[in-house]
A protein has these predicted regions:
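Short, aromatic/basic amphipathic alpha-helical patches
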Residues: 44-56, 254
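Conserved nucleotide-sugar donor-binding
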Residues: 159-171
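A glycosyltransferase accessory/donor-loop signature
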Residues: 1-2, 8, 18, 169-311
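Active-site-proximal specificity loops/subdomain of glycosyltransferases
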Residues: 52-95
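Short, acidic, metal-binding catalytic loop of nucleotide-sugar glycosyltransferases
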Residues: 22-31
Length: 311
């Protein structure tokens, strides 16, 4: 039985369905226990998600309205930063999951699973508490801001294999909520919290397990030692992470794998979804963006931030 943990509110329920549908498609012979942490979700939406999961395992809703005192305080004190409120629920994972659960795979919901997850789920943690991929885009800036050393990992927390038993043992010494409360002046998002709290206890995963939108930029600014990987990551991403503002559920998304989101969406109870625009097509900003995109596509302009198209 494969245990998956994810977070979503009512607004992101559709995207949970798409991500899980892709997971089940790529892993047809597996059974899953899905733990969905949420703060707001209607009964009708829950029924739709149960329908998505029922042929592949069990779905458990772990609900919380931030009534945990530590969460409430941290939420109040970091409200001006870039924390998405639903992300606070990550901090409650050790308390919310069943006591008999020792390992799980955490997945963000703005993803498409594009490969069998056996290798990922059964990662040898080698004594580390969690395994995840580097977050390259602003990695050095994050390290400098948080006071991390070169050997300390700054990860993208969208895909994590976690030894829950070891995390709970660590919590007995110093609860993550209390740790973050005492370091709140440093924190801009939940990834900062994971980097600091699990400092020295993180194993890096191969980048194929969390191929972020960053890798599809015209000239991604990553470490030279990883440049040789870029073409392979673009052509054969095992997990595609749509982690930029213009997500694949917007008409004006230019991500080359948006079509996979549309493919799996058709297999969910949200198949009649009408794609809105992220930027209004009536705005000057929209047409400037379109012009820049097509100038890049035609080779007239070279903008490092422009997303490539796959041939």
């Amino acid at each position: 039985m494969y245990c998956i943990v994810c977070l979503a509110n009512e607004a992101y329920a559709q995207h949970v369905a798409v991500m899980l549908t892709s997971l089940f498609y790529q892993n047809p012979q597996k059974s899953f226990r899905i733990f969905l942490m949420t703060n707001t979700m209607t009964e009708n939406t829950k029924k739709k998600l149960i329908h998505v999961v029922e042929s592949h395992g069990e779905l458990f809703f772990l609900e919380d309205d931030y009534n945990n005192l530590g969460i409430a305080m941290l939420k109040s004190e970091t409200s001006t930063k870039s924390w998405n409120p639903i992300m606070y629920l990550k901090l409650l994972i050790p308390q919310k999951l069943p006591v008999d659960l020792e390992r799980f795979l955490f997945l963000d919901v703005d993803m498409i699973i594009n490969h069998d997850i056996d290798e990922l789920y059964n990662t040898n943690l080698d004594g580390y508490i969690l395994a995840a991929c580097d977050d390259y885009k602003y990695q050095q800036a994050h390290r400098d801001r948080l006071g991390l050393k070169e050997k300390d990992e700054y990860i993208n927390s969208g895909v994590m294999v976690i030894d829950l038993k070891a995390w709970r043992e660590k919590e007995k010494q110093y609860q993550m909520i209390n740790f973050l409360e005492n370091n709140k002046e440093l924190l801009n998002n939940d990834q900062d919290g994971f980097a600091l709290y699990f400092r020295g206890e993180i194993k890096l995963l191969p980048n194929k397990w969390n191929v972020t939108t960053f890798y599809f930029e015209q000239t991604p600014r990553i470490l030279d030692k990883y440049l040789s990987e870029v073409n392979e990551l673009r052509s054969h991403p095992y997990i595609i992470h749509f982690c930029e503002p213009i997500k694949p559920w917007f008409t004006d998304c230019k991500h080359p794998y948006q079509y996979l989101y549309k493919k799996y969406l058709k297999q969910t109870p949200w198949s009649d979804y009408k794609f809105p625009f992220f930027i209004s097509p009536l705005s000057v900003k929209f047409w400037k963006s379109e012009l820049k995109y097509w100038l890049n596509r035609c080779g007239i302009r070279k903008d490092s931030m422009n997303l490539i198209s796959l041939k």
